[in-house]
């Protein structure tokens, strides 16, 4: 477990000693970088996010040929993206998304159950309903497209 602020070189060094990356960050620059580390080092990435009354969780697993990566879903739009520190977040959403991330992480580490790879869980906190979206790799993804074309 890493519980301190890390710059990019420190993140790269730390990634050599982990089995799963759990992304609980609040900015896209860090999320994109964690995604690159995940892909380069073949480490599963458990991604969770919450803003206002909405949350989402998925697993990107570069060890699986049909797994998309974070960049397959999200473009790099620079500083245009909202953060929960700017837009606010309904506090219970953090516990629900974080708990789901913890469950996915434990499943990966224990090699039990079916991880959320290729599926995005979306939580609507106002109606308290979950929905699931199937995810596929983007053939034009700048991070992982080459790995999908050669398999």
Predicted regions located by residue number:
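Conserved SAM/SAH-binding loop
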Residues: 2-11
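Glycine-rich phosphate/adenylate-binding loop
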Residues: 10-151
């Amino acid at each position: 477990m890493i519980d301190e602020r890390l710059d990019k070189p420190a993140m790269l060094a730390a990634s050599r000693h982990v089995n799963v990356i759990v992304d609980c960050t609040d900015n896209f620059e860090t999320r994109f970088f964690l995604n690159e580390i995940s892909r380069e080092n073949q480490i599963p990435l458990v991604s969770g996010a919450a803003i206002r009354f909405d949350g989402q969780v998925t697993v990107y697993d570069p060890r699986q040929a049909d797994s998309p990566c974070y960049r397959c879903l999200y473009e790099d739009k620079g500083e245009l993206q909202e953060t929960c520190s700017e837009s606010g977040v309904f506090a219970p959403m953090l516990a629900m998304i974080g708990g789901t991330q913890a469950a996915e992480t434990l499943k990966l580490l224990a090699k039990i159950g079916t991880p959320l790879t290729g599926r995005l869980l979306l939580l609507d906190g106002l109606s308290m309903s979950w929905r699931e979206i199937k995810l596929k790799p983007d053939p034009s993804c700048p991070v992982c497209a080459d790995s999908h074309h050669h398999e």
